[in-house]
Swiss-Prot record:
The keyword Repeat does not apply. Keywords: Coiled coil, Guanine-nucleotide releasing factor. Residues 1278-1508 form the Ras-GEF domain. Residues 233-250 have a biased composition (Acidic residues). It comes from the Eukaryota. Residues 1074-1234 form the N-terminal Ras-GEF domain. Promotes the exchange of Ras-bound GDP by GTP. One of its GO terms (biological process) is Ras protein signal transduction. Residues 1-73, 128-182, 197-272, 396-517, 565-593, 606-727, 831-1021, 1153-1172 are annotated as: Disordered. This is Ras guanine nucleotide exchange factor Y. Residues 9-22, 33-72, 199-216, 255-272, 413-447, 574-593, 606-660, 668-687, 831-855, 862-891, 942-984, 993-1019, 1160-1172 have a biased composition (Low complexity). Residues 128-150, 172-182, 492-510 have a biased composition (Polar residues).
């Protein structure tokens, strides 16, 4: 049989007189043991000494003194019985040893792997022990295997000079009971004692210090890890006298523990374990000596799973109290004499991280067990992780315990003998000690605050003050009803004694079932989060746990209330006053009171817990031997019925606990109009605070829910319930980049993600905005934040920085629409209210430039505001086109005085001379105060819809009279300017115009004069009578109409111009949206449409020139254009009655100056309608020819006859018609294009002057060559520089692609080398580069270098993606996905996860699923320069060409097909405009141009060789 020693920490104490005799006898025993002989007397002395070392009575330390002083007399007859009588008590340790205090339950790291040998059956058996206490005895008897041995401790020996001590303070190792049936000592016992006697001599030297607050730890090995720091020797020496006196008093009380049945059961089981391990355990080895595998496995942090004797600790007997505190000793803890079966269960959840719960069946207890269920799974789950149920009723705080324990009074106490540092604090639980005494003392810490729940007797001045002992104190909570009758101190000082007498109450199951998990979280949070020394340690409790506890403790009342500090209160708090120390000496450091709770329930809601605060004279500062002069925080002075908050749990420093109470009380004082704090010097003393903390206090007082952090709110919403960490093996760490936004898992902002795509090889979802350039405005939360934040608005919409803001003077000049009927001004001089220039025009001429614009022209809306055609209140801002749909109203600067004439098309801007312009009145019919609900609804619509439904301007003929204009232009009441749908358009009867002087009434937005003529003396007015309201317009206030002529919309104009033609079919749906889309037409009809004098469609012109070769020849088109030019005499006379109309060309310059306006007014009465119309048609023809020559000169490079015909036409009829300037412009363009083509053929092409020519090139990265003459390889070049040079090569080839190579499938015909040489070159290189990638990988026979090559290509592809070179990304991925490379499983397995994640991401990005949907979405958000993957466009062109008919059913040309082809070609041309600004590196560029590779069959053979 083996008697196991206990590891102890040696405390050098001055109390050495009581053990002199024992040390002498031990020396005598040493000599006897060396000779392997022993007498009965010496044996008794050995056992007595060992008994003294293991004997620890938590309630009475003086019992140890008596045992040590009388050990020679008591134990002479029955040594074994004396051992059995004492062995169940808690072992003593000596405090103050060197840091050799690593728990013996934790072996060396090398041997950790040997401890995880538990089986599934053992786990389940242990859980049955947890869940069914009545069956624990049977399970304990069945589980007596060799793995549950309690090893002996390696006891550090103290130096010879250290004085012996009388008794050990506490024990952190469990000791086993030896049954009384054992009647003698065997030789092995003597051998064991002889081997360990040297250590036992030091162990018997125990200290006499009073550590009554030290709790007896529960025997779970994990509790041994929750250690408090070791007490200093000086503090122990200063406490010896006081503690010894208290020990004597406790000894007189005669409180003795009684042994229960459960105690006997465990004692017999422990003895059987000792007997069984006697044969296994050899000589007195160390606990940590576990090198031999045949030796039993000693308890480690995880081996308690198989230790069935210490699965559950027993509840205390009735009449005893439990001290739950921080047992910070470093060895295994054991239960005191009152150990049984039904004690508070352990929370093993935190150990799941260490890999203990490897069994699947056991894991179901955490995942499938019902928390509140009555079944076995629910009970086991509650025993393991605890339930979060709390009942708060009428001032009594009741915690529900999951274990069915009897009526006990739990006292949360602190363990003495702890400093600010803990060596192995790996457990969340505090140790629970059983004590039959109800009196104990707690020594609070400097750093870790205690919960302010206390008893009046705590602050009574003790007769014997104690010296300060730095030890973090846990919460002091009585398990029954707690009534706070004393005000809490400003903060608990070092020597504050708390004597809490538990209140007896009848048996109540609800009170018995205390919420153990809540208590665990409270203690762990107090010891970990609030301890400054534990700040660097990762705590097992999270902020969510602490906030959850706070929310469960208090009600949800007063959600919106917040604390506001008044000036008087701030002044009072800043006033210093005398010190205060309740029954103790003051603390050495004053905690600022500004650190207040941020939790709104702690700071605002009044709980139901009755806490009466009485400011009695007992709280005055008492004398202390070691009192200092430091001041304590501000006092609390309230009425006796003030409610105080329960323990706050979410603070981050010790002062927050008491400061929250102060804040609550001071708020009540403020509510009672007590603006000044009553400084009661008899009770408390104020502490002056630094003014630095005042601003911090105001910040802390703010409700976190008033201005929440969006990220915090999202995390809180996701983690409504705190979940346990998943099981993992101890050696596997969590990847560091899993929770960080990476290429594989980018940060997502989509509320509804797009469709997930995957390639054939890797199936990984990629969101649309996994790239950095995407505007992340899909989340409504982000939209709202941007809308309410000025800086963010400027960040997302840079156009707002240069915008004109709406000033107050502008708003004052705006007449609301709903008041247009009622406002009548007698000011004849200011009829125009809305103008560009804010302020009133006091001259009789209203010549300020109006902001009325063309209907719906998006391009022109950037230059002028739209206020005349909308029923929203006119204002100074205008709508600017923004790429983001979220910027519905983006103010842009109002332009300088500009003409409302229609902006000319981009291809006729420099051809048409400025024609004269006529004047017409365009009135916005104001909507008076009517009962039309639809009108009111439309007036509230956003103006963004009107922009989206806008239409390019339409040039129409001008009516000759004002009467015709007014009668044919219906006022619009819709937000869409040109909408003519019945619900949104009202056509009033034609108004009657009366000439004469009448009282002016500004009932609408009278447009100002755009003319240069200022009729200052004009008193004659045009009064236009409209049934809705009266509008007074000066005769000079005439603006040139920018709407379709005669007020007709686009559908009407198209119907009039092509009413007799059957060779053209329009799409009526697009006409209703003011867009022209032709379904099918003949060549003649298309030429007539493109050159029509009333319609301007530049997009149709470009589409026609791109695709006309698919249905006709260039010579035929030129012939049709010349015929149209000469067809001016046969224009339809549809407007014969409008002889005074002026045909305004839409192909003139965008703005018209005052001189042009004068010319237009001087020619307004001309009768040359036909001549002007013919001139407009001729300009239209010349515009098409100019665009053809400039943008599509490749049609003339191989067709010299066509070019000669155009030159003859320009030098002949065009000059004869007086258009010499237009002819010279086109001829210059022809000469320039011819010179450029000749330069390209000769190879002397000049460098293209692009917008990047002025940019600085980024510095190139030269290759790393060891020798100048070394042949460079792929590994010598930098990944980024390879991507740059590859991008330069490919973009140069891409920019040479011509539009004619994309039509008629020229790239797939037999003569493709001639018709599409540039596309063929790109296709060849795209097929060569993947073979080169595969060849570089397969040719390397060494596995490591082969993996490095794969990593390099993945990195190059990633760099190409960052450079927007998607063509190179696709090429490299194609090479990596080839079968010869992809089959190399051993090579791919050696790649780091970082590269594999990047490879999967790139594959998902370029996946062909859903017709490259993800790639297309990403591409459309990239800015130039960009290099797209050309294969996607070629695929689209192939499908369009082969899947659609060239002609429609009526035999006409299928224009829809041509339009779609033109859109694809225009997108290809879009990315050719801007080139990359990288400096070419010749050595890398030449290397990339000379690449080559094996064919796929040879690659596969080589792949089989390197990896069969």
């Amino acid at each position: 049989m083996i008697i196991i020693g206990v590891k102890r920490n040696i405390n050098n104490s001055n109390n050495s007189n009581s053990n002199n005799n024992s040390n002498k006898k031990k020396d005598k025993i040493m000599s006897h043991n060396n000779n392997n002989t022993i007498t009965g007397k010496n044996t008794n002395e050995i056992m007595n000494n060992n008994n003294n070392s293991n004997n620890n009575n938590n309630n009475n330390n003086n019992n140890n003194n008596n045992n040590n002083n009388n050990n020679n007399e008591e134990v002479k007859t029955e040594p074994i019985q004396q051992i059995l009588k004492r062995l169940n008590s808690k072992n003593k340790i000596e405090v103050g040893a060197t840091p050799n205090d690593i728990p013996t339950s934790i072996p060396s790291v090398k041997n950790l792997g040997k401890k995880y040998d538990s089986k599934a059956e053992t786990h389940l058996l242990n859980q049955k022990v947890l869940s069914s206490p009545s069956k624990e005895v049977n399970s304990l008897k069945k589980s007596t295997n060799g793995t549950n041995t309690i090893p002996s401790s390696s006891i550090p020996s103290s130096p010879p000079s250290s004085p012996p001590s009388s008794s050990s303070l506490s024990s952190d190792r469990t000791s086993q009971d030896i049954p009384k049936s054992v009647n003698g000592l065997t030789a092995s016992i003597v051998a064991k004692f002889s081997k360990n006697i040297d250590n036992n001599t030091t162990n018997n030297n125990s200290n006499n210090n009073n550590n009554s607050s030290l709790s007896t730890p529960i025997q779970s090995p994990r509790d041994s890890l929750e250690t408090n720091p070791i007490k200093d020797e000086e503090s122990e020496e200063s406490e010896e006298s006081e503690e010894s006196k208290e020990e004597e008093e406790e000894l007189k009380m005669g409180i003795k523990t009684t042994k229960t049945t459960s105690e006997t059961i465990e004692s017999s089981y422990s003895t059987s374990q000792l007997l069984k391990n006697d044969l296994i355990q050899e000589k007195g080895d160390d606990n940590n000596n576990i090198q031999e595998p045949q030796q039993p496995k000693y308890p480690t942090q995880t081996s308690f799973i198989t230790d069935k004797s210490k699965r559950l600790s027993t509840p205390p007997i009735n009449g005893t109290s439990i001290s739950i505190g921080n047992n910070n000793n470093n060895n295994n803890n054991y239960i005191n004499g009152n150990s049984g079966i039904n004690t508070i269960p352990r929370n093993f959840q935190s150990h799941r991280v260490a890999g203990d719960w490897k069994d699947r069946k056991l894991n179901t207890l955490f995942t499938q067990g019902t928390v509140g269920g009555n079944g076995q799974n629910g009970t086991v789950r509650k025993n393991l992780i605890g339930t979060r149920e709390l009942s708060t009723s009428s001032g009594i705080l009741q915690c529900k315990d999951d274990s069915s324990s009897k009526d006990q009074d739990f006292e949360f106490n602190n363990s003495a003998g702890s400093s600010g540092n803990s060596s192995a604090s790996n457990s969340n639980r505090n140790s629970i000690a059983f004590s039959s005494s109800n009196h104990f003392s707690s020594e609070s810490s400097q750093s870790a605050p205690t919960l302010p729940i206390y008893n009046p007797s705590q602050y009574t001045s003790p007769s014997t003050p104690q010296s300060p002992s730095p030890s973090p104190s846990p919460p002091l909570i009585s398990s029954k009803s707690i009534y706070i009758n004393k005000p809490p101190p400003p903060h608990f000082n070092q020597q504050t004694n708390f004597s809490v007498s538990p209140t007896k109450s009848p048996s109540n199951e609800k009170q018995q079932q205390e919420d153990e998990d809540v208590k665990h979280l409270v203690r762990a949070f107090t010891n970990r989060k609030l301890n400054v020394h534990h700040a660097e340690r990762k705590s097992k409790i999270s902020v969510q746990d602490a906030e959850w506890i706070v929310k469960k403790f208090f009600h949800d009342t007063d959600r919106q209330s917040k604390f506001v500090l008044s000036e008087n209160r701030t002044k009072d708090l800043n006033q210093p006053s005398s010190q205060f120390s309740p029954s103790t000496s003051p603390s050495t450091n004053s905690i600022p009171t500004n650190l207040l709770l941020s939790n709104k329930r702690l700071s605002t809601s009044l709980p139901n817990i009755n806490t009466n605060i009485n400011n009695s004279s007992n709280n005055t500062s008492s004398s202390s031997s070691s009192s200092s002069t430091t001041s304590s925080p501000s006092p609390l002075t309230t009425s006796s019925s003030t409610s105080v908050l329960p323990p706050p749990l979410s603070s981050s420093s010790s002062s927050q606990l008491t400061e929250s109470l102060k804040t609550r009380i001071e708020e009540n004082n403020n509510n009672n109009n007590n603006k000044n704090i009553n400084n009661n010097n008899n009770n408390n003393n104020n502490n002056g605070r630094n003014s630095i903390h005042d601003s911090q206090e105001m910040t802390e007082l703010e409700d976190p829910h008033s201005s929440p952090s969006y990220r915090h709110l999202e995390e809180v919403g996701k983690k409504k319930y705190v979940s346990a960490e998943p099981s993992r093996r101890p050696g596997i760490k969590t990847p560091l980049f899993l929770n960080v936004p990476t290429l594989a898992m980018p940060t997502q902002f989509h509320q509804i993600p797009p469709e997930r795509v995957s390639s054939n090889l890797f199936s990984v979802s990629v969101e649309e905005n996994s790239y950095p350039d995407n505007p992340l405005l899909f989340n409504q939360q982000i939209i709202n934040r941007v809308a309410n934040d000025k800086d963010l608005s400027y960040l997302f919409f840079p156009v707002l920085k240069s915008s004109t803001k709406i000033t107050s003077s502008t708003l004052n000049n705006i007449i609301p629409i709903n008041k247009l009927n009622n406002q009548i001004h007698n000011n004849n001089n200011n009829n125009v209210i809305i103008s560009n220039n804010t302020g009133n025009n006091n001259n009789n001429n209203n010549s300020s430039k109006n902001n009325n614009t063309v209907k719906g022209n998006k391009k022109q809306q950037n230059k002028s505001s739209s206020s005349s055609q909308n029923n929203s209140p006119p204002s100074d801002f205008s709508l600017s086109v923004s790429p983001s749909p979220c910027s519905s109203l983006t103010p842009s600067p109002s332009p300088s005085p500009s003409s409302p004439l229609i902006e000319s098309s981009m291809f006729t801007k420099d051809l048409s001379p400025p024609p004269p312009a006529a004047a017409a009145i365009v009135l916005q019919q104001p909507v008076a105060t009517t009962n039309n609900k639809s009108t009111d609804k439309d007036s509230r619509k956003s103006l963004w819809s009107s922009m989206k439904s806008s239409k390019p301007p339409i040039s129409t003929s001008q009516p000759s009279t004002i009467q015709d204009t007014i009668s044919t232009s219906p006022p619009s009441t819709s937000t869409s300017p040109t909408s003519n749908s019945p619900p949104t358009s009202i056509s009033p009867p034609p108004p009657s115009i009366t000439t004469g002087s009448s009282p002016p009434s500004t009932a609408g937005t009278s447009p100002p004069n755009d003319n240069g003529n200022n009729n200052n003396n004009s008193n004659k007015e045009l009064t236009i009578s409209i049934p809705i309201t009266n509008v007074n317009v000066h005769e000079s206030n005439i603006v040139v109409a920018s709407t379709p002529r005669s007020g007709r919309d686009l559908a009407t104009i198209v119907a009039e111009e092509f009413k007799d033609r059957t060779d053209i079919v329009f799409c009526t749906q697009h006409l209703s949206m003011n867009r022209i889309k032709v379904r099918s037409a003949s060549l003649d009809a298309m030429i007539d449409l493109l050159t029509n004098h009333r319609l301007s469609q530049p997009d149709l012109v470009e589409s026609f020139l791109l695709t006309y070769k698919t249905f006709t020849s260039p010579l035929a088109v030129l012939t049709k254009l010349i015929e149209r030019y000469e067809e001016t005499d046969n224009i339809n006379n549809n407007n014969n009655n409008n002889n005074d109309d002026l045909i305004i060309s839409t192909r003139t310059t965008a703005t018209i100056t005052n001189e042009d306006e004068d010319n237009s007014n001087s020619n307004s009465n001309s009768n040359k309608t036909n001549k002007n119309s013919s001139r407009t048609i001729k300009l239209g023809v010349l515009s098409i020819i100019k665009c053809w020559v400039d943008r599509h000169h490749y049609d003339f490079e191989r067709n010299k006859a066509l070019l000669s015909a155009i030159v003859a036409f320009l030098e002949g009829p065009v000059i004869d018609d007086g258009m010499e300037k237009v002819s010279n412009i086109i001829l210059k363009i022809i000469d320039r294009k011819a010179n450029e083509a000749e330069a390209r053929r000769t190879g002397t092409a000049l460098v293209m002057h692009t917008s990047t020519s002025h940019c600085k090139f980024p510095p190139s990265i030269p290759p790393s060559l060891s020798k100048p003459d070394q042949i460079p390889t792929l590994q010598n070049f930098d990944d980024l520089e390879i991507a740059r040079q590859l991008t330069l090569i490919e973009h140069e080839a891409y920019s040479m692609v011509k539009p004619n190579e994309c039509i008629n499938l020229a790239f797939s015909k037999s003569d493709k080398e001639i018709r599409a040489p540039n596309i063929i070159n790109i296709i060849k290189r795209s097929n060569l580069l993947p073979l080169w990638v595969a060849t570089e990988i397969v040719q390397e026979e060494r596995l490591t270098k082969r993996a490095n090559i794969i990593k390099k290509f993945i990195s190059i592809a990633d760099q190409c993606k960052n450079l927007n070179n998607f063509n190179a990304v696709m090429e490299i991925l194609s090479g990596l996905n080839l079968t010869p490379v992809f089959r190399l499983k051993k090579t791919w397995e050696t790649l780091p996860r970082k590269y594999l994640a990047t490879f999967r991401h790139l594959n998902s990005l370029m996946a062909p699923k859903f017709n490259f949907k993800v790639y297309r979405d990403v591409l459309h958000t990239k800015n130039l320069p960009c290099l797209p993957f050309l294969g996607v466009y070629l695929t689209d062109l192939t499908f369009l060409e082969e899947g659609s008919f060239d002609q429609a059913e009526n035999g006409l040309i299928n224009i829809v097909k041509r339009t779609q082809i033109a859109n694809i070609i225009q997108e290809i041309q879009q990315y050719q405009q801007l080139s990359y600004s990288f400096a070419p590196v010749p050595i890398i560029k030449d290397f990339l141009l000379q690449i080559g590779g094996l064919q796929e069959r040879a690659l596969y053979k080589q792949s089989k060789i390197i990896e069969p």
